[in-house]
Amino acid sequence: MARIIECVPNCSEGRNKEVIEYIADAVRSVPGVALMDYSSDENHNRSVFTIVGDPDQMAEAAFRFAKACVEKIDMTKHHGEHPRMGAVDVIPFTPVKDVPMEECIEISKKVGQRIWEELGMPVTLYEESATAPHRRNLAAIRKGQFEAMPEKLKDPQWYPDYGNHEIHPTAGIVAVGARFPLVAFNINLSTSDVEIANKIAKTIRESSGGMRWVKSIGVMLEERNTAQVSINMTNYTKTPIYRVYETVRFEAARYGVHIIGSELIGIVPMDALVETAEYYLKLENFDKDNQVMEKHLL
């Protein structure tokens, strides 16, 4: 039986197609892994890649991804709506099939150490790989973004796990870790007022007293003149997609706006979508393990 893990690295480039393809080709050069998907957002100026494959080869694929980002992306010239602190901003590893979380943690440490030793980019371990409770949350690590990192890394609480207390001059710093599958979900509103998106994001995110397992910010999509609630769901089994969507819809109505569209970034676990379909279709006596064709084929 094949053993499979997933890696979903994010890079701080969403506009230059040549650079994005250069990074994609770096992943494709590694045998034993598959680049399943990659998507870019010009407003966020960010790309998300989904790689799956053999655990032994995934460490090499993640490193080559990071190396390509360091070679091609200059954070001193980067501007975008999405928070970021590095050229390769985050590298998460997720167990998929017959791989324990502990193995993903070890892979994350191996990759983090190599990024520092060979690329000179400091690394902070996060989520399940974190070395202290306050370092689990990516948003806390990234707070202040690239511009504030030189000062932040002088604080002993935020010393990198690999590297010294200085950021890479053009590549910044990267978070590497192991985690549960994440659902990246964006909801677009019928308004150009980004403050409304900010208020809704604050209401729904866990850090402000909202829903557990939800991280959210408001962003402005300049090209579409549309405000967006950008959401990361860190445990879709505890806080499902439909609940987040309905809460945003309810909160938007307070401001006289409605949802005009939504998008999923990257690959999403099948169960997350099946659960959403079950809710909206009001299915009775539905058995997802026996009534979903793909469950019998996988």
Residue ranges and their predicted role:
Residues 1-298:
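Long, contiguous binding/interaction regions
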